[in-house]
Amino acid sequence: MCIRDRTYRLPDDGDTRERAVCNACHTIHYENPLNVVGTIPVWGDKVLLCKRNIEPRFGKWTLPAGFMELGETVAEGAARETREEAGAEFEMGELFSLMNVTRVGQVHFFYRARLTSEHFDPGHETQEARLFAEHEVPWDELAFRTVKETLRRYFEDAHAGQFQMHHVDIE
């Protein structure tokens, strides 16, 4: 694969950003952000969290989420990840948060979701799927800052009685 021997430089095509350029065939390889998609599944006043059975952050709690696949929309990916990780039955809601994580080249999207059952069948990436009231959330054991920020905003909106879309830049 030619990308193994690459140099980051301005391509000869007038581009204004440095790109990965193959030293052998001069092909420009565009490296773009990855989308992480998930949900905030809710049963009454409780949210569903998944305890990770994979790295990174093995054993930490997270919302059901993962990388978007080719051929699916953001919402389809979020629904798929929720089924795969939590084995949850739910109805998709509106987009709740969009978080730019430029440090790692990712954009995280979380949708609200209403659980239609409190029974879960987690997949192999999840040790345990469990419902938490706000005061029970293991805040210091959350896997990712985007999850913590999304949950914090979710509970703030729930207390206010009105949900809004949140756009956040995380350094």
Model-derived segments and spans:
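Conserved small/polar residues in nucleotide/adenosyl-binding loops
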Residues: 1-5
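Intrinsically disordered, low-complexity segments enriched in small/polar residues
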Residues: 6, 27-28, 59, 109, ...
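Short, non-ligating residues that shape and space the ligands of small metal-coordination modules
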Residues: 7-11, 31-32
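N-terminal strand-loop-strand
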Residues: 17-62, 90, 94
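Unchanged
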Residues: 68-91, 95-153, 157, 161-163, ...
